[in-house]
Amino acid sequence: MPSKKESYESMIKELEKIVSSMENEELPLEEAMKNYEDGVKLCDKLYKILNKAEGKIKLLTENGEEEFKKAGDSYEQ
């Protein structure tokens, strides 16, 4: 399982490895369940990262549109 400081990209690669091993190997049930659990935890972390990024993008977009409108209003006067 990746550490908390790993990047989004490294977590995606780790998730891909887990999925690949589960698709291509005959794993004992215990190992398959461990891989599944690790994959679900990674998905949750990745989802949280994406949601946080989406929130930042929305905030920046809204602020940018407001600033753009203000700048446009000052040119019209």
Swiss-Prot record:
Q: Could you state one GO cellular component term attached to this entry?
A: cytosol
Gene3D superfamilies, sorted: Exonuclease VII, small subunit
A Pfam family annotated for this UniProt entry? Exonuc_VII_S
| Record-level Gene Ontology MF annotations | exodeoxyribonuclease VII activity
Q: Which UniProt keywords apply?
A: Cytoplasm, Exonuclease, Hydrolase, Nuclease
This protein's source sits in the domain of life called: Bacteria
Show the catalytic activity: Exonucleolytic cleavage in either 5'- to 3'- or 3'- to 5'-direction to yield nucleoside 5'-phosphates
Give the family from UniProt.
Belongs to the XseB family.
Q: What is this protein called?
A: Exodeoxyribonuclease 7 small subunit
Q: From what organism does this protein derive?
A: Clostridium acetobutylicum (strain ATCC 824 / DSM 792 / JCM 1419 / IAM 19013 / LMG 5710 / NBRC 13948 / NRRL B-527 / VKM B-1787 / 2291 / W)
Q: Which gene encodes it?
A: xseB
